[in-house]
Amino acid sequence: MKVREILESLNEKQRRTVQKCLASCEILDLEEEVVTELSGDLIDFVKVLSNPIRAGILKMLKNRWMCVCLIAKALNQDQTLISHHLRTLKRMNLLHERREGKLRFYRTNLEELKKYVYMLEKELL
């Protein structure tokens, strides 16, 4: 949406108020696009990180491989809950998975995590 379109959507009183502040807001071009949305991938990433268990898993696994039972014990959570969070993290490619027989071990995919952090920085800073 352009600044001009935003102004046109306001009532007369609001428009006068906003027009007074345009220079102070350093908005000089009424055709400038105002972007308000993040990409879907970034929204999903922020949602994933907003959960303290998932954030804890990523932090705990940044330098080590661990199995589900150890992760559950370290976070004092039920193993089925941890498995649910691991699936969510794997779906976003934020975890590496290694299998040894029936056991599965997990580690944070730092390259993918860095990619999301870079995208977030690029969008917001």
Indicate residue ranges for each PLM-predicted region.
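Beta-hairpin "wing" of winged helix-turn-helix
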Residues: 90-100
